UniProtKB/Swiss-Prot annotation:
Function: Transfers and isomerizes the ribose moiety from AdoMet to the 7-aminomethyl group of 7-deazaguanine (preQ1-tRNA) to give epoxyqueuosine (oQ-tRNA).
Protein name: S-adenosylmethionine:tRNA ribosyltransferase-isomerase
Transferase among keywords: yes
GO cellular component, one term: cytoplasm
Protein keywords: Cytoplasm, Queuosine biosynthesis, S-adenosyl-L-methionine, Transferase
GO biological process annotation, one example: tRNA wobble guanine modification
One function term, GO molecular function aspect: S-adenosylmethionine:tRNA ribosyltransferase-isomerase activity
Pathway participation: tRNA modification; tRNA-queuosine biosynthesis
Family, per entry: Belongs to the QueA family.
SUPFAM superfamilies reported in the protein's UniProt record: QueA-like
């Protein structure tokens, strides 16, 4: 299957640069791939798509202020590090700029030396493994020195960093937000729960690979990035009970889908408590094992996320829905509007 099969025209002005004032006031395109229907709505009406006894599954990861600006103590050259994932202890995989100046043994200081990084390994594409040294608690030091790592297609400064977090963000570790969840308010979640829908949380720490375009023509040659996930026993039991009672598992976003389908694939369709690393690539031809419906934002052309949605709803219908969204001036990407896929 060719990457170009998932391309579409997207006017640049439809790429949302800032969040709307109210999280749940974004537009919602409701599509049903069996009936081949599309309905224009608003996000706070997502409650009408959920039935008593369903489970709404959300990713409770929290975005780290993962962009650090520092300098080399020997040359005073400026350095930017973007934290990708914690590999062990105080060691992190990072994206470094300018990478060519950062060889094994190089040091970088941040915040007058309150945080120091030593390069201990060189990876491809500007990647490095660094070991941090600091006084106190790492996350507190990071909160004081780091900046929120907004996606490369957002050029406006974010006034309130919490708008790039979901209202239920809890587990620190992501380099990017699980953006399908940004539309939910605490009030909307209370109403959904009052309707008899089970609110279930899992964790997948989103890496920067989520923004990387597919660089090969043949999808079979694409290497997916790896991300850490976790599902608790309590959450797994709730999902098993929902399935057994005939309810649906409704995922919020592609990160929740990838976690649930990783677990479903590992346990032959059963839902078990689990944690580990996943590089699952869901593309047309994939048979879904756990997820019955989902919400998601509008994604980049030729991205693995468009391929995932196409695997569920069919490529032609998804691209038709995207053309409709462009015609109706839906807002795209992280701060954009959403779709609900039945």
């Amino acid at each position: 299957m060719n990457t170009n099969n998932f391309d579409f025209e997207l006017p640049e002005e439809l790429i949302a640069q800032t969040p709307l004032e109210k999280r749940d006031s974004s537009k919602l395109l409701i599509i049903d791939h069996r009936q081949k229907t599309m309905v224009d709505s608003h996000f706070d009406h997502i409650i009408d798509q959920l039935n008593p006894g369903d489970a709404l599954v959300m990713n409770n990861t929290r975005v780290l202020p993962a962009r650090l600006y520092g300098e080399k103590p020997d040359t005073h050259g400026h350095v930017e590090l973007l934290l990708l994932k914690n590999t062990q202890g105080d060691q992190w995989e990072v994206l470094a700029k300018p990478a060519k100046r950062l060889k094994v043994g190089s040091q970088v200081n941040f915040g007058d030396g309150r945080l120091k990084a030593t390069i201990i390994d060189e990876l491809e594409h500007g990647g490095r493994i660094v070991e941090f040294s600091y006084d106190g608690i790492f996350l507190e030091v990071l909160e004081s020195l780091g900046e929120m790592p907004l996606p490369p297609y957002i050029h406006e400064k974010l006034e309130d960093a919490e708008r790039y977090q979901t209202v239920y963000a809890k587990e620190n570790g992501s380099a990017a937000a699980p953006t399908a969840g940004l539309h939910f308010t605490t009030d909307l979640l209370k109403k959904i729960e009052a309707k008899g829908v089970h609110l279930v949380y899992l964790t997948l720490h989103v890496g920067l690979g989520t923004f990387r375009p597919v660089s090969v023509d043949n999808l079979d040659e694409h290497d997916m990035h790896s991300e850490f996930y976790s599902l608790s026993e309590e959450a797994a039991q709730t999902l098993r009970d929902v399935k057994q009672a005939g309810g649906r598992v409704v995922a919020v976003g592609t990160t929740s889908i990838r976690t649930l389908e990783t677990i479903g694939g590992k346990f032959q369709g059963d839902i078990q408590a689990d944690s580990g690393w996943t590089n699952i690539f869901i593309k047309p031809g994939y048979q879904f094992k756990v997820v019955d419906a989902f919400s998601t934002n509008f994604h980049l052309p030729k991205s693995t996320l468009v391929m995932l949605v196409s695997a569920f709803a069919g490529r032609d219908f998804v691209l038709e829905a995207y053309r409709h969204a462009v015609d109706e001036k839906y807002r795209f990407f992280s701060f954009g509007d959403a779709m609900f896929v039945n």
